[in-house]
Amino acid sequence: MDSDKGESQGKPETPGDESPKRILLDIAPSAWEHPADKAALQALRRIPIFDEVLKKMFGFFGEKPVRLAFQADAVHVSNKQFPEVYRLYKEALRTLDAPHEYPLFMSQTPMVNAGAYGMNKPFIILNSGTRLLLTDEELQYVIAHEIAHIMSDHVLYKTMTVLLINLANMGFPVVGVAARAVLVGLLEWSRKSELSCDRAGLLAMQDPEVVMSAMLKMAGGPTSQDRTNLNEFIVQADAYRESGDVADQVFKVLNVLGRTHPFHVLRVAELRDWVESGDYDRIVSGQYARRGEPDSAYEEDLRAAASAYADEARDLLDSITGAAMQAGSDFLSGFRK
């Protein structure tokens, strides 16, 4: 998305704008990326045959067929189609100072979800159920969350995850045991990546209550003010925070469940930790890493997180490396004619 960069710092919107949100000029994705996200991706790339599987998958499908498969049953959002959603989208792009406007589509499905997909040409799919459940501000948070997946270069791996899950559900012969190692690693990383983009969504909204309210609704379904209580949901999230290592065990259980996203209560707890650390306020005040500039502070945080994550990553790799080596040739042969 083209914009006048002005000074190399965030700045408030002008008096004529609809909100006092600070535009985060030139913000680098590393400003919001959760260190565990990067550590998990590093572990994923160490899985035997991962790179080869990635190449074979996209060589087999190709970008255009994948794009058409996602977009064939969806409506392109614009100033003429879903104009209010488009307005929210444009504002989120502006606040995060996204370098491009990515195609946004609305898909008719009651499932409350959204996703960013693609290879070289990323796009966003927004489910209509999400539009019906959430307020405009809550919906904008979801949209900003997906913009962040694109800006953080998550979409290639996100797309691969969806393809492997769908192939497995269809009984595709190469996805029974052979690709399980790669899929388990992708799911582990996918959940960590959501923590990064939750932060970006908050930066776009600059109102923690909006984000937590959206998560409350996504966790509990349709709601009204006299039936749910956001404060009670926050108390529930705080209980997770106080459980310490139990939260890490939850992530491991999710490997068995095959979830692509962490539980919403856990996400709220992680987000509150980040806000209370002071990092959120520093970014909104204009102190953040910028695109094209080195970020030594983030690199130090990443090293610390990678060290803390090492045992978990090693356990994951140990549990699937043998299967990957044994099944790798079978998986790859499934794509040969």
State each model region's role.
Residues 86, 193-194, 265-268:
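Amphipathic alpha-helical transducer elements in NTP-driven molecular machines
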Residues 76-80, 125-141, 188-192:
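Short pre-active-site segment immediately N-terminal to the catalytic Zn-binding motif
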Residues 1-120, 281-337:
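Hydrophobic or amphipathic, alpha-helical segments that drive membrane association/targeting
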Residues 134, 143-152, 196, 200:
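Active-site His/Glu-centered metal-binding helix of metallohydrolases
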Residues 166-194, 201-204:
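Post-HExxH zinc-binding segment in Zn-dependent metallohydrolases
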Residues 147-166:
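Catalytic Zn2+-binding segment of zinc metalloproteases
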Residues 49, 106-120, 182, 204-304:
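Active-site-proximal gating segments in proteases and membrane effectors
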Residues 89-93, 140, 190-212:
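An active-site-proximal "capping" alpha-helix that borders the catalytic cofactor pocket
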